[in-house]
Amino acid sequence: MKRIPSLIIGLLLILATWHSVLAINDNYDLIIVRNDDLIDYLISLPYSHLINAPILPVNPKELDPVTKAQLYSYIQLGRDKVLIIGNTNAVSLDVEKELRDMGFSVTRIGGADRAETAEKLALHFYQNGSKVVILASAWDYGSTLAAAEFAMEYKCPILLTWENQLSPSALRGIEKLNAKIVILVGFGINETIEKTLEGMGYETYWIGRDIEPPPIETTTSSPPQSSGSKSFFLGMIVTLIILAPVILYLWRRRSERMSEFLEQFNEKELAVLKAIMERGGEVKQEDLPRIVGYSRPTISRIVQDLEKKGIVEREKSGKTFIVRVIKKIKID
């Protein structure tokens, strides 16, 4: 646990060094998101903070009278540029038409799914690129909330990925932003994603996992700190205080989810899984009876059950099968 504060402080120093250049062709007075799913709201937070525009969650199908009254008051004050986040499944064309009929100039940024929407937002608001990007799970809202807080504080774009593999949208975003450093946040991401990024040459750090602190270049002498530097380090301390309960919550949630996940397996299934993982994650099915001591019919039934649960896959190899773990789990 002692490594976590050092890691975060190191990351903040790196973020300060790799400061991103922001370029926005259009400014917006208001950001519209759907009110029945938090994900679009969360990924819009960093950009709302960048342009000082409020976020208004609305009914995705139609504007209710109360919302219309708010919007009428807003446009009368000269705030008429609206950004809708999400495709027409997220916020309908009817809502967009209502906004235009009220006199708003409407821009929509949305993709085929939440990961692509996050990619398009990042590229729209960081048209000059960003050396650092924040990466979170598209389905772990707690991690995305923490990632959004980091992105707000240090002006970095946020991207979303799938749990077990790097989403194509996240990869495109990282490449088009010309990123050098990818910061993964939370427990909703499989370690294979980090390995994929490292294999492609990106420098990665993981907030919410106990890893070694990154190397930080130091000098023997440094100029006197300005008031801006003091404010920056004060901001780091505040960030640590804010994130501490979030990280603790994510850790507890991960432990609970892992416990619930393991409950779906019986003793024999766990024994077979452990045997496969101890041998590098794959083994010949014909060798399993000897390794775990179960009969061939029992092994065949267990492997088929694990395959149905999406934990292993089988590949034909001669007269037997190669059984391969495709979703890594920790078995004590």
Curated annotation (Swiss-Prot):
Ribonucleoprotein recorded as keyword: no
Pfam families on file: CW_binding_2 (PF04122), DUF7343 (PF24034)
Signal peptide region: 1-23
Keyword terms: Membrane, Signal, Transmembrane, Transmembrane helix
Domain of life: Archaea
Membrane topology: Single-pass membrane protein
Compartment(s) of residence: Membrane
GO cellular component, one term: membrane
InterPro entries assigned to the protein according to its UniProt record, in alphabetical order: ArsR-like_HTH, Bact_Sporulation_Assoc, Cell_wall-bd_2, DUF7343, WH-like_DNA-bd_sf, WH_DNA-bd_sf
Ranges annotated as spanning the membrane: 231-251
Keyword Ribosomal protein: no
This protein's name: Uncharacterized protein PH0614
Protein's organism: Pyrococcus horikoshii (strain ATCC 700860 / DSM 12428 / JCM 9974 / NBRC 100139 / OT-3)
